[in-house]
Design a protein with these regions (language model features):
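Juxtamembrane "anchor/assembly" segments of surface/extracellular structural proteins
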Residues: 1-80, 116, 123-129, 135-138, ...
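Hydrophobic beta-strand residues in large extracellular and virion-surface proteins
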Residues: 21-25, 67-71, 85-89, 106-108, ...
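Residue-level signal for glycine
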Residues: 29, 98-100
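Residues that flank catalytic or metal-binding motifs in active/ligand-binding sites
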Residues: 65, 104, 196
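Short coil-to-beta transition motif at edge beta-strands of beta-rich domains
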Residues: 77-95
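Charged- and aromatic-enriched interaction segments used to assemble
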Residues: 97, 112-209
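Short beta-strand-centered aromatic/proline hotspots
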Residues: 101-113
């Protein structure tokens, strides 16, 4: 969890809140395009995140967060495929200042241009786990499987080994039967989440939590 001030916590509880977004786009080639609140088309920005697909609690869910935004920008859309988008939320406090909170990192999946605007759709690092899994002879506890998945998909892990082993069934030995319907590393996370009695989402530093 990202640390915030007492003033921030108080402002969050108010009936009306004043906040704004800033961020930057970094292409795979390392070119950085910062943008500020005034660059964002009013009403265009959104972040959708969830931990279950219905009104009921579901164990083992592995949902990716989606972000969409439209910018007043002349940036060429073609170099933006797979580009990294870092968003920050700025909440206005009682004294009139703004406190910044960084969001998870998103990767651009769609970039479209109009005459004056750039439309982006992006997802967080959870989609990196949509990679074919071939470790069907793997045996270990939940931590071993999570560590394997994160290293294979180049994603950090928010919890320590001690954190995972302290969870329900965290020290149980797990294995994958040869006959299974696992296709991707995301499927592995799904089953590990069920064993632990939880779900997975991206934490503030784009690490599964």
């Amino acid at each position: 969890m990202y640390p915030v001030s007492d003033a921030f916590l108080q402002a969050v509880q108010e009936n009306t809140r004043n906040y704004r977004w800033t961020g930057q786009i970094t292409t795979k080639g390392g070119v950085v395009y910062p943008f500020v609140y005034e660059d964002i088309v009013k009403g265009s920005g959104y972040v959708m995140a969830q931990c279950c697909g219905s009104a009921e609690i579901e164990l083992g869910t592995v949902y990716a967060a989606e972000m969409g935004i439209t910018l007043f920008s002349q940036i060429d859309r073609y170099p933006l495929e797979g580009a990294e988008v870092r968003l920050s939320s700025h909440l206005r406090l009682a004294d009139g200042s703004y406190e910044k909170v960084p969001m998870v990192i998103f990767e651009v999946s769609e970039a479209n241009r109009t005459a004056h605007c750039l439309e982006l759709k992006a997802y967080d690092y959870m989609l990196r786990f949509e990679k074919s899994f071939n470790g069907f002879e793997t045996v270990g506890n939940a931590w071993a499987f999570l560590d394997l998945c994160c290293k294979a998909c180049n994603v950090g892990l928010a919890h320590t080994q001690a954190d995972i082993e302290a969870m329900p069934n965290g020290t149980e030995l797990l294995s994958i039967y040869p006959e299974n319907d696992i296709e991707t590393y995301r499927d592995v996370l799904y089953f590990v989440g069920q064993v632990l009695g939880g779900f997975f989402c991206m934490a503030g530093k784009s690490s599964p939590s």
